């Protein structure tokens, strides 16, 4: 399951603390990105994991973050995956 949370930049540290310190959520793959990657304000948190991880993340951040709309979510996920592929290509070139 994949979700993307959207929140204000001023809440970045708080959201990181909440999610990364939680025993359930911290088992998921978590990536934080500035909204500028898709031309938006704020910050995004991409979470990929089991349904249990994603539901817990939503529950823990319900007062400071919201789930991104489908279009935004897809753009953020696409950008993150593109960056991952580019990093892997660079890594492959080093050890190629």
For the regions a protein language model found, what residue spans apply to each?
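Short amphipathic alpha-helices in soluble, non-transmembrane regions
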Residues: 16-23, 54-66
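Long, contiguous binding/interaction regions
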Residues: 18, 27, 31, 55, ...
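Long, compositionally biased, intrinsically disordered regions
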Residues: 2-6, 10-15, 67-71
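Helix N-cap motif at beta-to-alpha junctions
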Residues: 8-12, 48-55
